[in-house]
Amino acid sequence: FILCLCCALTVAQATGEDRLNDSDANVFGHVLDKKTGEHLPFINVLLKGTTIGTTTDNSGHYFLKNLPEGKFTLEYKALGYKTVSKEVSLKKGKTLEINVELEEDQIALDGVVVSANRAETSRRLAPTLVNVLDAKVFTTTNAVNLAQGLNFQPGVRVETNCQNCGFQQVRINGLDGPYTQILIDSRPIFSALSGVYGLEQIPANMIERVEVMRGGGSALFGSSAIAGTINIITKEPLRNSGELSHTLTSIGGTSAFDNNTTLNASLVSENGKAGLYLFGQNRHRSGFDQDGDGFTELPKLKNQTVGFRSYLKTSTYSKLTFEYHHMNEYRRGGNLLDRPPHEADIAEQLEHSIDGGGLKFDLFSKDYKHKWSVFTSAQNTDRDSYYGTNQDPNAYGKTTDLTVMAGTQYAYSCLLYT
């Protein structure tokens, strides 16, 4: 109710504010690579502490118009480059030209993280050590899901504990999987039931970055964060783009294949006030028998995922964000995979249907020093299962799990422009 009321009040307020916001205070310029001198496309240009931002176009140029008056900081950031900040004084009817050069960042210390203190903080200034897996790591390693990407993070190990069903758990500092808290967009909706097979169910193409914080974080994230915290940040729309890809991988050089098809699309309105990012994945992996004994070492998988993340800037000082994902997965391990599970000697078969999402409303004060957020997230998991041996007809089961959370957060920044 509070969230709906806030949105209604803000939308009602937005029209009047937009009329008053024709300040004609503008900033334009270009962004260059410091080493090569080439123009850089798709660089994020943000007015720090606000919801205002854009990206450079194909020629490396950008334009921000009708900005609020006052002293602000412009940030220029992109994957693989050090963040550059420029102080600006915006005045009514004045247009500024600001050109910048970006330098490659080999160790990614200038990235922004949210897992250290629940607020956006430069990784360099974060009070605790936060390691980041970005989208580049998933692409370079050809990882198709979260589990495959986490293997490239120091101090983190993903291990398979069952050859029949392929159950995987993540270990941080040697502790078992239940001692690690997994978050989606900083929300603890990834339940114990989802966590059993969830590492393979989250596709890489929905992930913007993964923040890994090793060590206890119970004060911030609850009693499950004893070994550490893994925070999955989903992708936001940045520019109009689309991508369709398919990979075919032979498992062990045999006739068992892993087929993976992904779809991504990003749509942003011309004025930058609304955006939508769509993602989808269809994966099929054959069951794999390494030693020829008739029992699988890797289970058969069929996985379909679809979802989106969108935002709407309801005014200059407010933003509404919505995320949704749907996952279907079938997995079967054991022997005699072409028969019903109760006719096999050993069989573990699971069918998952997962629906989850979140809604967040951010409201800033006019000087952007005060920020108030209201949020809610939920995830529902339905699982049909069979765990049995010796052709047991009574080994079928069904499990349902619903996780819902809601909250509010207030933040005050006393050093907004430094």
Task: Describe the predicted segments one by one.
Residues G37-L40, F63-K71, L79:
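Short Pro-Gly-centered beta-turn/loop motif in secreted/extracellular proteins
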Residues S191-L193, M206-E208, A219-N231, K235-G292, ...:
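Outer-membrane beta-barrel translocator/receptor signature
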Residues K65, Q169-R171, R187-R214, K235:
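Short acidic/polar hinge/loop motifs at secondary-structure boundaries
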Residues T15-D18, D22-D24, H30-T36, I43-K48, ...:
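Short, acidic, small-residue-rich periplasmic hinge/interaction motif at the N-terminus
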Residues A147-S191, E208:
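Extracytoplasmic beta-strand/coil segments of soluble accessory domains associated
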Residues T50-H61:
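Short, acidic Ser/Thr/Gly-rich low-complexity loop/linker segments typical of extracellular
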Residues R285-T305, Y311-K313, Y317-W372, A378-D401:
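Flexible loop and strand-edge segments within Gram-negative outer membrane beta-barrel domains
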Residues Y417-T418:
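Conserved small/polar residues in nucleotide/adenosyl-binding loops
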